[in-house]
From Swiss-Prot:
This is Large ribosomal subunit protein uL5. The keyword Protein biosynthesis does not apply. GO terms for biological process: translation. InterPro entries: Ribosomal_uL5, Ribosomal_uL5_bac-type, Ribosomal_uL5_C, Ribosomal_uL5_CS, Ribosomal_uL5_dom_sf, Ribosomal_uL5_N. One of its GO terms (molecular function) is rRNA binding. It comes from Bacillus cytotoxicus (strain DSM 22905 / CIP 110041 / 391-98 / NVH 391-98). This is one of the proteins that bind and probably mediate the attachment of the 5S RNA into the large ribosomal subunit, where it forms part of the central protuberance. In the 70S ribosome it contacts protein S13 of the 30S subunit (bridge B1b), connecting the 2 subunits; this bridge is implicated in subunit movement. Contacts the P site tRNA; the 5S rRNA and some of its associated proteins might help stabilize positioning of ribosome-bound tRNAs. Belongs to the universal ribosomal protein uL5 family. Keywords: Ribonucleoprotein, Ribosomal protein, RNA-binding, rRNA-binding, tRNA-binding.
Amino acid sequence: MNRLKEKFQKEITPALMSKFNYKSVMQVPKIEKIVINVGVGDAVQNSKALDNAVEELTQIAGQKPVITRAKKSIAGFRLREGMPIGAKVTLRGEQMYEFFDKLVTVSLPRVRDFRGVSKKSFDGRGNYTLGVKEQLIFPEIDYDKVSKVRGMDIVIVTTANTDEEARELLTQFGMPFQK
């Protein structure tokens, strides 16, 4: 069993039960899924760029991403509907906990001038979105093999009803929020 999952069941659940006065264990918010999205703008001119992004995302997440396509044509960006423009991967269960553990303990501390993640990135429904400026913070990415520095969005979807509950949940999991 994963370290974080065990911590959730043994420590976090009772702590949240007492803090928010839940009547049932099923009311306690939990992390439902983590979605990692990489937008590759250069894929319009250069289809090789997308292959590299997919390869890197596979290494980071540990599973094969799905290629996202343009919903609309935008003439200004020379974009046609249906063109591949990015990749995303949805993690659930064991892999989700593995990735979150790695993100909090290894990757985020490797960010330059890191002072904690923003408290304002909640969406009002208990989900948290985190933007990463470069993929090099992940230990799986080999610095020498990187063709281009790419950012990504990491969305942590929780079952919490309010931002306050979600913030408390992520703080208990060890998410380093700004003071």
